[in-house]
Structures are given as C-alpha cells and as structure tokens.
C-alpha cells in the first residue's frame, strides 16, 4: 500500500472559563470593485468590511485597498485601529462603485509589500470573484507570483459570494498562503459571513 499525503485541520479550544487573550493583528482588506462585481455584491462587501473593522481592537492595525485595474489604498501603510481611523475607513468605503477591469495581481501586490509587525500575524482578506481581466490572467502564474512575493509574511483569506466565482483560483491562492477561502452561496449572506 502506498502512503498518501494528507492534510488536517486542528482546532484548539481552551478550558471553559480560561479564554486565551486576543493577539494583536495586522489586517488588510483587498476589495475587488471592478465591473464584474455587481453593485449589490459590492455593497454587501463594504458593509461586512466596515463591521469587521469596527470589531478590531486598539492594538490591531488595518488597511483597505480597493482594486480594479489599479489599486486605491485607504492609507499608504497599516494604521492603528483607533476610533478616528475606523470612522475614516467608513468614509473611504462609503459609495464605492463597481466599474472598470480587474487586475487581481496589482490589487494585492501593494499589500504584500507592506511590512507586518514582528511577532504579529499579518492577514489579508481578498474579497473578489477571482476573475482577472487585466494584468496576470493565468491563474497558476498569478498564484505562484503572489505566493513568491508574499514569502509567508501574510496569511491570505479569500472570500466571495454568489455563483460567478473562480473558486479554484481563490481556494489555491488561500491554500498556498496559509489561509482559507469561503464562498457564500447567496450574495445576501456575504455581509454576515465576512
């Protein structure tokens, strides 16, 4: 019999009444706002990201990048999760419109070149349909290039909703970068699941 490689997921649960202290984290939300993302899906995404940012703690840092054919960053680097920065982020997310082409590589590249703090988990949430229309179009090349440039600095979690998703690309991008992917079957579920 041949040995097969396998993978498993381990969930560690503390004893009841002995909660683990939360770790500080550096989180970036990379939001695909191209025309392939219908406005209803983009609105759900913005609400989910805003709610996620509101849940960040004072010792967390965050950033947002909205990408189409070019990226637009909320801030040039990660910022502290102060109430002032959270309010500014809500303003940044307000009214984003679905338009233009999709360059997934250029949307994520500036984020993986930001430096997370030493000893602090770096997390990127990519919210996209995983269907590039500009830049690197080949899924394998896109995943390999981003993974090589990331150098395990960030865990990448991919998220989407609806039925028009390249789940293969999102799954492999997350897997190769120590993350997970999740596709909400209905667009209306995106806000809650994110």
Language model features by range: what are they?
Residues 1-194:
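Exposed acidic/Ser/Thr-rich ligand/metal-binding surfaces
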């Amino acid at each position: 019999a041949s040995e097969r490689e396998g993978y498993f997921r381990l969930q560690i649960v503390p004893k009841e009444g002995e909660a683990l202290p939360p770790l500080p984290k550096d989180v970036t939300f990379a939001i695909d706002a191209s025309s392939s993302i219908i406005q209803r899906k983009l609105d759900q995404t913005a609400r989910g990201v805003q709610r996620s940012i509101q849940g960040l703690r004072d010792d967390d840092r965050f950033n947002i990048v909205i990408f189409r054919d070019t990226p637009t960053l909320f801030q040039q680097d990660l910022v502290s999760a102060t109430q002032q920065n959270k309010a500014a982020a809500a303003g940044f997310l307000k009214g984003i419109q679905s338009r233009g082409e999709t360059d997934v590589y250029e949307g994520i590249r500036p984020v993986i070149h930001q430096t997370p703090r030493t000893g602090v988990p770096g997390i990127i949430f990519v919210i996209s349909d995983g269907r590039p229309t500009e830049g690197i179009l080949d899924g394998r090349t896109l995943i390999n290039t981003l993974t090589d440039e990331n150098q395990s600095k960030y865990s990448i979690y991919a998220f989407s909703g609806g039925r028009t998703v390249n789940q293969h690309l999102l799954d492999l991008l997350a897997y190769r970068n120590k993350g997970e992917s999740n596709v909400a079957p209905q667009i209306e579920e995106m806000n809650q699941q994110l």
